[in-house]
């Protein structure tokens, strides 16, 4: 079976290695537009249940991921001077870059072909495959091209959020709510390696505008967030790794994506299934632990 995965994020890479592991005779290729070690974002989170699923699907990959994970059982909520802790939840964090590198290495070990720095502008060029996986992300070109088949419903939600990082190490899945003169602002933080935590700042759009984030530079916005959430940072600074974004562009409104169908049949005879996967098919909000 010839399989082409368009997009080398976690979904495309993991599907590729599982298919190759299931049958070494499969001809599996992953095509990614970025370089091997280019990635954006900070850490991602998996629940204990998800880790169990990974262990069942491919113990080798799961073992490498588990070695790199930072595990916690507590969720901590901070609001109006109160600290509330709930235990027994079981989550793990890992750096997105590290996760991708583990998946890339496992793909190569199994014989999956990895093609980088290649931008697929016409998915029909790969319609000679028996199966095409459209794992090309949230802003999937393939989903857009065959919109009439997939019939996506994209709902852009109200709140604005920004992905930041810090060297303050949080020992629990931490939610911090701060009531400001402009309204409520929230931080969502978790550790994902020995040195770094993800720190997401979120607020309603009206609060974001009232606080002036719309006209702030990236540096000004970070300084403002450090001031609001300083009590949780213990003197540590906040960091951005979105060097490709400027000013208010680093603030995102969550797009809830669902599709009526995940399969389009392409190629000359319309027999090649082009299947949406990952964020191209559906999105998951970071608050449920899918970083």
Predicted feature locations:
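Conserved N-terminal helical subregion
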Residues: 48-163
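Short, glycine/acidic-enriched loop or turn micro-motifs at the edges of active sites
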Residues: 35, 139, 282
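Conserved FAD-binding catalytic core of PHBH/FMO-like flavoproteins
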Residues: 128-254, 258, 263-266
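Conserved mid-domain beta->alpha element of the FAD-binding
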Residues: 5-21, 133-134, 250-291
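Hydrophobic "anchor" residues on beta-strands that sit immediately upstream
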Residues: 3, 28, 113, 130-132, ...
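Glycine-rich FAD cofactor-binding loop and adjacent beta-loop-alpha segment at the N-terminus
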Residues: 1-72, 78-80, 88-98, 290
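Short strand-connecting beta-turns/loops that link adjacent beta-strands
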Residues: 24, 82, 108, 169, ...
């Amino acid at each position: 079976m010839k399989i082409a995965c368009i997009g080398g994020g976690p979904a495309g890479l993991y599907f590729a290695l599982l298919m190759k592991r299931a049958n070494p005779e499969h001809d599996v290729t992953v095509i990614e537009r970025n370089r091997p070690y280019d990635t954006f974002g900070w850490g991602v989170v998996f629940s204990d249940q998800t880790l169990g699923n990974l262990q069942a699907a491919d113990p080798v990959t799961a073992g490498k991921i588990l070695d790199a994970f930072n595990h916690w059982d507590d969720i901590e909520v901070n609001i109006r001077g109160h600290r509330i802790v709930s235990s027994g939840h079981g989550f793990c964090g890992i750096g997105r870059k590290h996760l991708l590198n583990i998946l890339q290495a496992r793909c190569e070990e199994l014989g999956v072909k990895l093609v980088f720095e290649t931008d697929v502008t016409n998915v029909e060029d790969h319609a000679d495959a028996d199966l095409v996986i459209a794992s090309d992300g949230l802003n999937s070109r393939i989903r857009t091209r065959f919109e009439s088949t997939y019939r996506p419903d994209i709902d852009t939600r109200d709140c604005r959020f920004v992905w930041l990082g810090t060297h303050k190490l949080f020992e629990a899945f931490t939610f911090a709510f701060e009531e400001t003169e402009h309204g409520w602002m929230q931080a969502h933080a978790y550790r994902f390696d020995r040195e770094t935590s993800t720190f997401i700042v979120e607020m309603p759009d009206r609060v974001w505008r009232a606080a002036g984030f719309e006209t702030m530079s990236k540096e000004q916005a970070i300084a403002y967030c450090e001031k609001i959430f300083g009590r949780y940072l213990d003197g540590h600074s906040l960091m951005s790794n979105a060097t490709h974004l400027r000013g208010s562009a680093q603030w995102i409104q969550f797009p809830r994506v669902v599709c009526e169908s995940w399969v389009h049949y392409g190629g000359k005879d319309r027999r090649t299934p082009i299947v949406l996967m990952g964020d191209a098919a559906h999105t998951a909000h970071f608050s449920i632990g899918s970083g």
